[in-house]
From Swiss-Prot:
SUPFAM superfamilies: Bromodomain. This is Bromodomain-containing protein DDB_G0280777. Residues 580-590 have a biased composition (Polar residues). Residues 306-413 form the Bromo domain. One of its GO terms (cellular component) is SAGA complex. InterPro entries: Bromodomain (IPR001487), Bromodomain-like_sf (IPR036427), Spt7 (IPR037782). Residues 251-262, 432-486, 494-511, 520-555, 570-579, 753-779, 863-884, 949-958, 1055-1071, 1205-1378, 1679-1705, 1756-1767, 1789-1806 have a biased composition (Low complexity). One of its GO terms (biological process) is regulation of transcription by RNA polymerase II. It comes from the Eukaryota. It comes from Dictyostelium discoideum (Social amoeba). SMART domains: BROMO. Residues 44-83, 200-281, 429-654, 753-781, 855-886, 949-993, 1055-1079, 1190-1386, 1453-1477, 1679-1823 are annotated as: Disordered. One of its GO terms (molecular function) is structural molecule activity. Residues 631-643 have a biased composition (Acidic residues).
Length: 1823
């Protein structure tokens, strides 16, 4: 069911009426009819609700509709959904705030009720408070106990943690000591091990040396024996040769017999061959069978056991699976490239990847699972170390996943270790090889040779070599593998040894790189000599042996390497040949050499084959040769013998080698044993060290954690203190207070004052009787009060009908706004201070009036007098409140003010919307909170007080204008009387008392608050509207404090910027009001929008704020007021912004902007819907208390009823004697003030003549006079106090108030009366100063005389006015004595004394009122006459001044025409800033002045640059001249060498004087340069000084200009705007002429410099002219004609100059004003001048060429002799070198063409012809 209220239905029916026709608003009767219809239709509905608020009854009925009604309502809702939902405020009659009479009666009734209610409430409150306190104490005890327990627990925890920390710290120290001990033992073991090894090596080297010495001796013996054998053999050979010859003879004889036998034997030989062929074929079959046998291939060859093969297969599968894990394995497959990661190999010293692990696995380098796992872990650790950046987290994740998978795969691999087994095998094989070599027979040793079984580590390496040796072979010793530790990585293989081919000649040993000893060299020579005879024998049997060289580990010591090289060299020297062959398969792949049996088989087969071949060869030799069996036997015997000898030698050598090998093997075995022992010990120590280090780290981590926990806990001392304090606070005995409740009575100020009277008991009795009577009459008063209420309500309805209709219309218009929160446009009372500015005076008036009324109720005799006093008091209160009205207010405020003016009542409920307050604040206000208002108003910030005090100190005279205007309304007859006079007086008061706020205060307050708020939140970005939106968030906290100061003088709505709407309605005949003082000015219409944007709205302002915050963050100083720092930075910006403004410097006067508009019934001015930001931002939702937006609805100007009634006779507590004294004293004061005013006026006249000294004197006079006034007032008040004898306390209070009010009133009257005169005189002087800055002193004196005359006349009028005003002031002295102290003092004397005083005062007041009314009418008539006279005088003065201006301008024009400036027109160099002639646009003129200043600075800079360029050019020319001179000297020296010695002497004699002249010229040039530099420096200094002076003058002039602008009146604006355009043109001419004069002052300085340079030139050139007079006579005769022709040309040019100078100078000044026709004529003239100049130039060139030709001819004629020719070629007097050496004068600027020409003519006459020719060379070309 839809729950619909009665108000909604009313709105539905009235919606169309209000939405379409706002004028057809319902009346009261129509509203009542609508209510009745709903009551009749809904009788059944009993859900009516009523509520009362202050006497008004509003009936709101909620009813449940029937089904039929629901359908109708639904249909209506559907229709109305399309339309806008508009909520209408009900036309409800609010409760009245009672009048003053009713309030006094009703207050007595309410006091008792309120006291009873208060007592009951307080009684219950105290009970509740006691219960609350009881429970609070219990809760506090619980909290204290809980805290105590917590602190106890924390202490226990702290003690436990400290004990743990001490124990673990001891353990950690123990572990550290153990570590140090183990480390020391490690170092000792290492040192001992190294010492033992060194000793063994020394013993081994000694044994080897002894053994070698023995071998050397044996060799010497053998050599002797061999020599003897050789001799024997030679002899035997000789015998054999003889025998052979004999045999040959015999053989020839038997040759024939042999042929026969051969045929027989041929058959035998064929059979033998067949047998031999079969044997060879059988051998081949065996070979083929051996090759066909193929062993099954294995992945890893060289492994000894099957367990090792299984381990390698498992590791291979792990690697393959990791590689196949492609999602995460791709970064670890290959090496890292340096291009991808350049710093990788600098950070990671041991790189590893999967490809490198596969290589190591193929090389059989992994001997355990642990080594393989280390390499895998190394890959992942390298990845984590390098990829520490966040960009490398991806690779770390890949590494983590690969590590997980590797752990899963490695679980399947068996944990085996084969490192120790390999070492044992190596040792056993070495021993077996030694034993087998000793047991082998001699024959087997020749055929098979010795073989050394390879080591396991040798097999793992890919580099294996096979060597074939001829008779003897040497086995390489195994490396010292045991020296290396087990934990080291596997050995890397060394490069394979070079392979040597088999040859009959002996080969060099393999170790060719190592050097041979002399003993070894002898052995090699012997072996070569022995092998030569044997090499020829055909039956040299060769034995092939395979020797496998073991790889050398990189970690072997250098000593082991040296020992092996020595052994190899010794073995190679003894062996005849040791060659190696690589056994290869058919495919070319190296076969493995693991099985020693296979090698032996091949070697045996090779030996058998060679034997068979030798046998076949022998058989063939036997057939060919015819030797006998005997010879063959002999040869065999010889061979056998040789073989036996060789075998013996070999056996000896083998024995020697074996002995050496035994020594080495023994040494190696000892070292191995030592290494094993050392390794075992070190392993144990390393394990122990690791365990201890882990323990230490564990202890450290635990200690750190414990320490953190201790740090988090509070200290033990604090805990103990807290525990002790808590124990003291604990109390178990807590009980309720059962004592009696005593409530003190509510005591008003009246009761307190009465109780304080101890002397007068009668008065207390009377008060008690009165209170009893009041209690009895309460019931009767209540009944009468309700009857009167109905009458007043009817009056209220009739009077407020129009106002209520207006208010409804306004709210309906406001409801049409497009946003939800309409209250955002209305400011709350908390932030508005327009009507809440209730001073203490008003509050005290109210209290005193109530007190007087209560006294009058008690006294029956004085009722009539009391009624009169009450009427007067009410009238005075109303008039005082009218003074508090703002001149500008919002629409709602005006509506409420209209209600208040009707004197019917007030709506307290509307204060939230209307920002207004009742006349008399009730004891219990409904909506207004005085606490919030008082706190905000009475406690301003210190910075604001400083600023306000500073502004008051500067404007003491203007801030004391608070005038008290009291309005009297005694009936409709009084209101109609004198309305026209009142309006005129109001206009005058508005002129005298403008509502003004200083613009400086507004800027300072806003800039301070914003700067402080930005310190906390610096969020400013952007410009214009966006910045303002951000300021709303920042400045919201600041509006509540500072907005109250502005809202005293302004309303919600801003002032209209467009003056066209207001100025149209003002009458033309009415004179404009006088201007405000120069020091005060209004802020603009919208405060935040205008001020904040001017300061910080631009982007530059925001940047400056940011810079300010950055600077402040760097600086450590803290300032209370940051504005004083910002003012320095923003000073230039404010000046520019002020200059840009056009009209009034951003200041607006209320009287000009808001004038009374006669618009008919509704005096409304429509303004555009623009707030601070131009629109309502929809994303901002403000609360109702804070509002930055302005009500867009129309503004209504209130009618200003500011009539000046100077009759305030309410509270004159002084006697007649006191008043008479005051009259006399005030008359004296007025006389003093008049004298002061005369001084002020005279001083102002002098100040306008720009005399600073006079201004200072005038200020001093003003201050002294003001002090005199104050002193006089104080004396007068003291006299008043002496006359008062009855009431001491009252007189003391009155004396204080009189001191203040007399001073204020006297000063205000004197100042206000003299404002018009001073301002008028100042304005007249400003006209003279602004327009006639160049006038004579005589005119100023005349003006001053006129002004003095006016001042005297005005002062006479002021005296009369002051005398009249003093009478008013005497009556007004005691109007404001409303403090509560007099009430307290009167209670001491009793009620009777107070009543007598009041009666006397009332009688005295009635008499004074009649007198004052008569005086007031007379004063008004006098004022009107004075104003008329003043206006007439001002008009006359203006006419006189205008005529004087015209005369002065004519005189100046005549003077300017007579002047003939020597210089042509130049651009404006400098212009004195003058006061603006067109005052409607002062800011444009300021901009022009700034532009002129910039132009001046630019021109000065250009001049400086030109001077610098000239100086540089001169320097360059001098350098060129010096270079040319050097070249000439070199040429002269070369020619002198060729000339005859006699000629040389002649030339030297001639050149000596010339050289002297050149030296003198150089000295003079240097001096000139120095002078020029000094002059330039001086000029620069002068220019800088001038610039500084100009800047200072400009600043002073700008300040004066601002002051003058502020002092100008709107009347001057109109007058000057009406001036003719011709006069304005003349004023512009004056400015331009002054600029030309300044330029003329600058040019003579430049001309003097040029003349000095030109005077120096002829002096330099006269010296060489005197030396050669004979040679130059002919040249002078020829060139005399040229200067005459040149003199004619400059004569033509000066004739043109005066023509140009005679032209009127107005051409320069009136260029901007001249017509276009005149401009065209000037252009044509300029073109003609340029054409003439070009013709002159051509004519000069022709003459130059002719003069050059003639000079050449003359020189050729003069050079007759060879000597003279040589001298002329080399002499510096020739024209070319002189022209180069001569410094050219500085080029004249284009701005001064005429002056340079005139100067050149004068110099050419004095210069001789040759010098003139030299000058014409280069400078004329530059022209």
């Amino acid at each position: 069911m839809d729950h619909i209220t009665m108000e909604e239905k009313i709105n539905k029916k009235t919606k169309h009426i209000f939405s379409n026709n706002y004028d057809n608003i319902l009346s009261d009767k129509q509203v009542q009819c609508i209510y009745k219809e709903f009551f009749n239709n809904n009788k059944d509905n009993n859900n009516n609700k009523r509520f009362n608020e202050n006497g008004n009854q509003i009936n709101q009925i909620d009813f449940n509709s029937n089904k039929e009604e629901e359908k109708e309502e639904k249909e209506e809702k559907e229709k109305e959904e399309d339309e806008d939902n508009i909520t209408i405020l009900d036309d409800v009659y609010y409760s009245l705030e009672y009048d003053f009479e009713d309030y006094i009666k009703y207050s007595k009734i309410l006091t008792e009720k309120i006291e009873k209610e208060r007592i009951t409430q307080l009684f219950e409150q105290e009970k509740q408070n006691r219960l609350i306190r009881y429970h609070q104490r219990i809760q506090q005890q619980k909290v204290i106990k809980e805290q105590l327990n917590v602190n106890m627990e924390l202490l226990e925890k702290r003690k436990l943690l400290e004990t743990e920390l001490s124990l673990k710290s001891n353990q950690l120290n123990q572990c550290q000591t153990q570590l140090q001990q183990f480390q020391s033992t490690m170092t000792l073991l290492q040192s001992q091990h190294q010492q033992t090894i060194n000793k063994l090596k020394q013993t081994q080297s000694e044994q080897l040396q002894k053994r070698r010495n023995q071998q050397h001796q044996n060799l010497l013996k053998k050599q002797k024996i061999q020599k003897e054998k050789e001799e024997r053999e030679q002899k035997e050979k000789e015998q054999k040769e003889k025998e052979q010859k004999e045999k040959e003879e015999q053989q020839q004889q038997l040759f024939l017999l042999q042929q026969q036998q051969q045929q027989e034997e041929e058959s035998k030989t064929t059979n033998k061959k067949k047998r031999n062929s079969r044997t060879t074929s059988i051998n081949r079959v065996f070979r083929s069978l051996l090759t066909d046998v193929k062993v099954p291939a294995k992945k890893f060859n060289g492994l000894k056991s099957e367990a090792q093969e299984e381990m390698y297969d498992q590791l291979d599968t792990v690697l393959n699976q990791l590689k196949d894990y492609s999602d995460h394995s791709f970064p670890f497959l290959t090496k890292v490239r340096p291009s991808e990661a350049p710093n990788y190999y600098e950070i990671i010293k041991k790189p590893m990847d999967l490809s490198l692990m596969t290589k190591k696995l193929k090389k059989l380098e992994y001997q355990s699972k642990f080594e393989f796992q280390l390499d895998l872990n190394l890959i992942f650790t390298n990845c984590r170390i390098y990829n520490t950046d966040p960009s490398g987290k991806v690779y770390v994740e890949h590494a983590n996943k690969m590590e997980k998978k590797s752990k899963d795969l490695m679980k399947n691999v068996k944990d085996l270790d084969f490192s120790m087994d390999i070492l044992k095998d190596i040792v056993d094989e070495n021993k077996n090889n030694n034993n087998s070599n000793n047991s082998v027979d001699n024959n087997n040793s020749l055929k098979k040779g010795r073989t050394s079984t390879p080591n396991k580590k040798q097999k793992t390496s890919n580099s294996t070599t096979t060597t074939t040796t001829t008779t003897t072979t040497t086995t390489a010793t195994t490396p010292n593998l045991l020296n290396t530790p087990l934990s080291s990585p596997p050995y890397t293989p060394c490069s394979p040894s070079t392979i040597s081919t088999v040859s009959s000649t002996p080969t060099t040993p393999q170790s060719a790189d190592c050097p041979l000893s002399p003993f070894q060299q002898q052995q090699q020579q012997q072996t070569q000599a022995q092998q030569q005879p044997t090499s020829n024998s055909p039956r040299n049997t060769t034995t092939t042996t395979t020797t496998i060289t073991s790889p050398i580990s990189p970690r072997e010591t250098n000593k082991d390497v040296i020992m092996e090289e020595e052994e190899e060299s010794s073995s190679s020297s003894l062996s005849s040949s040791s060659l190696a062959l690589n056994s290869q398969n058919e495919n070319g792949v190296n076969k493995s050499i693991e099985d020693s049996t296979g090698v032996k088989m091949e070697s045996e087969e090779s030996t058998n084959v060679k034997k068979e071949e030798n046998q076949s060869g022998d058989c063939e030799n036997q057939t060919t040769t015819t030797t006998t069996k005997e010879e063959g036997e002999e040869q065999q015997e010889q061979e056998d013998e040789e073989q036996q000898q060789q075998q013996q030698q070999q056996e000896e050598q083998t024995l020697e080698i074996e002995n050496e090998e035994d020594i080495i093997n023994n040494f190696n075995s000892e070292i191995e044993s030592l290494n094993n022992d050392f390794s075992e010990k070190t392993l144990q120590l390393s394990i122990q060290i690791k365990e201890i280090s882990e323990k230490t780290e564990h202890f450290k981590i635990n200690n750190s954690k414990i320490q953190q926990n201790l740090d988090e806990l509070p200290l033990a001392d604090k805990l103990n203190l807290d525990i002790n304090n808590a124990k003291e606070l604990v109390d178990d005995n807590i009980e309720l207070d059962d004592s009696e409740i005593i409530i003190p009575p509510y005591l008003n100020n009246n009761n307190n004052n009465c109780n304080n009277n101890n002397n007068n008991n009668d008065n207390n009795n009377n008060n008690n009787i009165d209170n009893d009577n009041d209690n009895n009459n309460n019931n009767s008063l209540e009944n009468s009060f309700e009857i009167e209420k109905s009458k007043k309500i009817n009056k209220f309805k009739e009077l407020t009908k129009e106002n209520r209709v207006r208010k409804l219309k306004y709210f309906l218009d406001q409801q049409s706004l497009p946003f939800n929160k309409r209250e955002a446009f209305i400011r709350t009372p908390y932030f508005m201070n327009t009507f809440y500015n209730l001073d203490l005076q008003q509050q005290n008036q109210k209290q005193q009036q109530i007190f007087n009324q209560e006294i009058n109720d008690n006294d029956d005799d004085n009722n009539n007098n009391n009624n009169n006093n009450n009427n007067n008091n009410n009238n005075n209160n109303n008039n005082n409140n009218n003074n508090n009205k703002p001149k500008v207010m919002s629409a709602i405020q005006k509506m409420d003010q209209d209600f208040m003016d009707l004197k019917v009542g007030f709506f307290p409920e509307l204060t939230h919307l209307s920002n207004s307050i009742p006349i008399i604040t009730p004891n219990y206000p409904i909506t207004c909170k005085n606490s919030s208002i008082d706190n905000s108003v009475t406690t301003p910030s210190k910075s604001l007080l400083r600023l306000l005090n500073s502004s008051k100190s500067n404007n003491n005279s203007n801030n004391k204008k608070e005038k008290q205007c009291n309005y009297n309304r005694e009936g409709e007859d009084d209101e109609g009387r004198g309305e026209e006079q009142k309006e005129k007086e109001e206009e005058k008061e508005d002129e005298d008392f403008p509502n003004i706020i200083t613009n400086d205060i507004a800027y300072i307050l806003l800039s301070k608050s914003i700067a402080k708020s930005i310190e906390s939140e610096s969020c400013l970005h952007g410009t214009t509207q966006e910045t303002m939106l951000i300021f709303t968030d920042i400045v919201s906290s600041f509006i509540g404090k500072i907005g109250k100061l502005f809202n005293k003088y302004y309303s919600n709505n801003g002032l209209p910027n467009n003056k066209s709407t207001t100025t149209q309605t003002t009458p033309t005949t009415q004179l404009q009001p006088p201007p405000p003082p120069p020091s005060l000015s209004l802020p603009p219409s919208l405060l935040l929008n205008s001020i904040v944007t001017d300061i910080f709205g631009d982007s530059l302002g925001i940047l400056l704020l940011k810079d300010y915050m950055i600077k402040k963050s760097k600086n450590q100083q803290i300032y209370d007021d940051p504005l004083f720092e910002l003012e320095v930075e923003f000073e230039n910006d404010h000046l520019q912004s002020d200059n840009i403004l056009q009209n009034n410097n951003g200041d607006i006067d209320i009287n000009e902007s808001m004038e009374i508009d006669i618009l008919g019934e509704d005096d409304i001015i429509d303004i555009d819907d623009t707030g601070l930001f131009g629109h309502y931002p929809r994303y901002i939702e403000e609360p109702a208390e804070i509002t930055l937006f302005i009500d867009p609805k129309p503004i209504q100007k209130p009618t200003t009823n500011t009539t000046t009634n100077n009759n305030n006779n309410n509270n004159n507590n002084n006697n007649n004697n006191n008043n008479n004294n005051n009259n006399n004293n005030n008359n004296n004061n007025n006389n003093n003030n008049n004298n002061n005013n005369n001084n002020n006026n005279n001083n102002n006249n002098n100040s306008n003549s720009n005399n600073n000294n006079n201004n200072n004197n005038s200020n001093s006079n003003n201050n002294n006079n003001n002090n005199n006034n104050n002193n006089n007032n104080n004396n007068n008040n003291n006299n008043n106090n002496n006359n008062n004898n009855n009431n001491n306390n009252n007189n003391n209070n009155n004396s204080i108030n009189n001191n203040n009010h007399n001073n204020n009133n006297n000063n205000n009257n004197n100042i206000n009366n003299n404002n018009n005169n001073n301002n008028n005189n100042n304005n007249n002087n400003n006209n003279n100063n602004n327009i006639n800055n160049n006038n004579n002193n005589n005119i100023n004196n005349n003006n001053n005389n006129i002004n003095n005359y006016n001042n005297n006349y005005n002062n006479n009028n002021n005296n009369n006015n002051n005398n009249n005003n003093n009478n008013n002031n005497n009556n007004n002295n005691n109007n404001n004595n409303n403090y509560p102290k007099p009430i307290q003092a009167s209670t001491q004397t009793g009620n009777l004394g107070i009543q007598q005083q009041l009666q006397q005062q009332q009688l005295h007041q009635l008499q004074q009122q009649q007198q004052l009314q008569q005086q007031y009418q007379i004063q008004q008539q006098q004022l009107h006459l004075q104003q008329q006279q003043q206006q007439q005088q001002q008009l006359k003065l203006q006419q006189i001044q205008f005529q004087q201006m015209q005369q002065q301008q004519q005189q100046q024009q005549l003077q300017q025409q007579t002047r003939q400036p020597s210089q042509p027109q130049t651009p404006q160099m400098q212009s004195q800033p003058q006061t603006p002639q067109i005052l409607s646009q002062p800011q444009q003129q300021l901009q022009q002045l700034q532009q002129q200043q910039l132009q001046q600075q630019q021109q000065l800079q250009q001049q400086q640059l030109q001077q610098q360029q000239l100086f540089q050019q001169q320097q360059q020319q001098q350098q060129q001249q010096q270079q040319q001179q050097q070249q000439q000297q070199q040429q002269q020296q070369q020619q002198q060498q060729l000339l005859h010695p006699q000629q040389m002497q002649i030339q030297q004699n001639l050149q000596q004087p010339l050289q002297q002249i050149q030296q003198q010229q150089q000295i003079q040039q240097q001096q000139q340069q120095q002078l020029q530099q000094q002059q330039q420096q001086q000029q620069q200094q002068q220019q800088q000084q001038q610039q500084q002076q100009q800047q200072q003058q400009q600043q002073q002039q700008q300040q004066q200009h601002h002051q003058q602008l502020q002092q100008l009146q709107p009347q001057q604006q109109q007058q000057l705007q009406q001036l003719q355009p011709q006069q304005l043109q003349q004023l512009q001419q004056l400015q331009q002429l002054q600029q030309l004069q300044q330029l003329q002052q600058l040019q003579p300085q430049q001309l003097q410099q040029l003349q000095q340079l030109q005077q120096l030139q002829p002096q330099q050139l006269q010296q060489p002219q005197q030396l050669q007079p004979q040679q130059l006579q002919q040249q002078q005769l020829q060139q005399q004609q040229q200067p005459q022709q040149q003199q004619q040309q400059p004569q033509q040019q000066p004739q043109q100059q005066p023509q140009q100078q005679q032209q009127p100078q107005y051409q320069t000044t009136f260029q901007s004003i001249a017509s276009p026709k005149e401009k065209d004529k000037e252009r044509e003239k300029e073109k003609e001048r340029e054409r003439e100049k070009e013709k002159d130039r051509k004519f000069k060139k022709v003459k130059k060429t002719e003069s050059k030709k003639e000079s050449k001819k003359s020189l050729n004629d003069s050079s007759n002799s060879d000597i003279n020719t040589s001298v002329e070629q080399h002499s510096p007097l020739s024209p070319q070198p002189i022209s180069s050496s001569k410094p050219t004068p500085p080029p004249v600027s284009s701005k001064q063409p005429q002056t340079t020409q005139s100067n050149t003519t004068t110099t050419q006459d004095s210069i001789p012809p040759i010098e003139q020719k030299k000058k014409r060379g280069r400078p004329q070309k530059k022209q």
